[in-house]
Amino acid sequence: MRSHYCGDVNKSHVGQEVTLVGWVNRSRDLGGVVFLDLRDREGLVQVVYDPDLPEVFNVASTLRAEFCVQVKGVVRARPDSQVNAQMKTGEIEVLGKALTIINSSEPLPLSLDNYQNNSEEQRLKYRYLDLRRPEMAQRLMFRAKVTSAVRRFLDSNGFLDIETPILTKATPEGARDYLVPSRTYKGQFFALPQSPQLFKQLLMMSGFDRYYQIVKCFRDEDLRADRQPEFTQIDIETSFMTSEQVMNKTEEMMRGLFLEMLNVDLGEFPRMTYNEAMRRFGSDKPDLRNPLELVDVADLLKDVEFAVFSGPANDEEGRVAALRIPGGASLSRKQIDDYTKFVGIYGAKGLAWMKLNDLTQGLEGIQSPVLKFLNENIVNEIINRTGAQTGDIILFGADQATVVAESMGALRLKAGEDFNLLEGQWRPLWVVDFPMFEKINGSFHAVHHPFTAPRGVTPQELEANPANRVSDAYDMVLNGCELGGGSVRIHNQEMQSAVFRILGITDEEAKEKFGFLLEALRYGTPPHAGLAFGLDRIIMLMTGASSIRDVMAFPKTTTAACPLTNAPGFANPQQLAELGIAVVKTAKTED
């Protein structure tokens, strides 16, 4: 039905007859001539109908927005005065010779031109219309090109695309599972995979030493702008490769992807340990475009007569950190109060500050509610250590180290945005040497997952002192977003059992949940390592979208619902009876 896409017609086609199909983006009658903007996935082209062909002209005069039509005509160059440089096809137009209305359209329930006026609910309910917008179409086509480039790279490097099961067994991976009841085994359930983690490890044990899969994963968790109940991973696993080799290979892939898709050279990715990232930036995924850093000053404040500072400064688990904001002395008291409320969201009890109005006047040129507790030597050392100058403000976080990192790390990002301090467009890095475990409510939890290998210890040494052990794990970070994370995996049954015990998983529970893995580890398991990238997040960053919902064809809402299909829905009684399931209505509790 077509000879060309609308957006592909150009000056090289002048004089040629073309057949186009698409949707009427806009139609207007100007002085007896009908101008039609025809749209398809590749873009827009202007079609002109004049009265010389009255039958065709009369049909063209009836067109309305979003009619689906076929156009036949001859390509001609526009006069120089009419060239539209903002339009891909702006140098030409098509003189219409024939026109077929394939299907008419009722007035749309949402606007495609002023889409900002559409609610998120409307956009998702009528997603098939929202996707007609050029911006949305371009993002999905960009996504298709990215997945194609990823496949080409991995295929050319000896990786095999192998599918793993979607119906599998529930395993503790951090989030709630989506459960699928079994009709055959009543009362038992499959789980939709949160990742193909265990199956890809089993593939390594099977001898497929380079695996990849672009795969759907499912997590029943609270949603945010960068979370969806179903999402797509670029999943990679290798045998006989070190963490360094895995990082080098996947970095090569990501650098090639940005060069091919955006003509951006990311350069070599710097490496930073987890401890350094938390100390300097208060985050394990630091945005290096932001030049602000947290500076430790606890050693200067241990003896001051101000418990807010001296308390955390003398606490092994406490921290006092300073954050210098260039030009921040211009902040009003209300703005400082707003910052104080902001850090309170992250558990901080307050925010001390010091305005450096004029350093040539010594302490007289400094304004601060805590200045009376500090002598001149301490103030000067804080100024020197932070690199502060006249016109700056220094903000202080003092609390448990975790609270300081989270609150001041978030404030660092906010201040960087507020003061337009971000430098450069793309700043990647690797964060390495993560802790093996973290303690939550007195119990150990895996920082990555229970199958991550520790670095350089025996099972006995790990169990003797789990709190201070480092994992052989690595995260790729770009502009403050984690693109992907991975690790060397445990390939020794004794080590895997030790990790389970540290996590409070008894031998009986481990056998019930992971017996297949523990047995597989007995049969010559090779060393293996891997990584998984969040494809949706990569596309979001590369296209400048504000949410991963804008780079997915049919996403869910922030409450994990689909307004388009009204999913989830109720199952009919017969289906429930076949599954042996009864729905129990819980009474709402009153306050």
Curated annotation (Swiss-Prot):
Which controlled-vocabulary keywords does the entry list?
Aminoacyl-tRNA synthetase, ATP-binding, Cytoplasm, Ligase, Nucleotide-binding, Protein biosynthesis
InterPro entries reported in the protein's UniProt record = Aa-tRNA-synt_II, aa-tRNA-synth_II, aa-tRNA-synth_II/BPL/LPL, Asp-tRNA-ligase_1, Asp-tRNA-ligase_1_N, Asp/Asn-tRNA-synth_IIb, AspRS_core, GAD-like_sf
- Disulfide-bonded cysteines: none
Could you say which residues bind L-aspartate here?
A: 173, 219, 448, 489
Record-annotated residues binding ATP? 219-221, 228, 482, 534-537
Domain of life where this protein originates: Bacteria
Mind telling me which CDD domains this protein's record contains? Answer: AspRS_core, EcAspRS_like_N
Q: What is one process in the GO biological process aspect for this record?
A: aspartyl-tRNA aminoacylation
Q: Name one GO cellular component term.
A: cytoplasm
Q: Which Pfam families does the UniProt entry name for this protein?
A: GAD (PF02938), tRNA-synt_2 (PF00152), tRNA_anti-codon (PF01336)
EC no.?
A: 6.1.1.12
**Where is the protein found, in the record's own terms?**
Cytoplasm
Keyword Protein biosynthesis part of the UniProt annotation: yes
Judged by the first EC level, this protein's enzyme class is ligase
Q: Where is this region: Aspartate?
A: 197-200
Per its record, the protein catalyses:
tRNA(Asp) + L-aspartate + ATP = L-aspartyl-tRNA(Asp) + AMP + diphosphate
This entry's Gene Ontology molecular function terms read: aspartate-tRNA ligase activity; ATP binding; nucleic acid binding
**Briefly, what is this protein's role?**
Catalyzes the attachment of L-aspartate to tRNA(Asp) in a two-step reaction: L-aspartate is first activated by ATP to form Asp-AMP and then transferred to the acceptor end of tRNA(Asp).
Assembly and partners are described as: Homodimer.
State the family named in the UniProt similarity comment for this chain: Belongs to the class-II aminoacyl-tRNA synthetase family. Type 1 subfamily.
User: What protein is this chain from?
Assistant: Aspartate--tRNA ligase
Organism source for this protein?
A: Shewanella oneidensis (strain ATCC 700550 / JCM 31522 / CIP 106686 / LMG 19005 / NCIMB 14063 / MR-1)
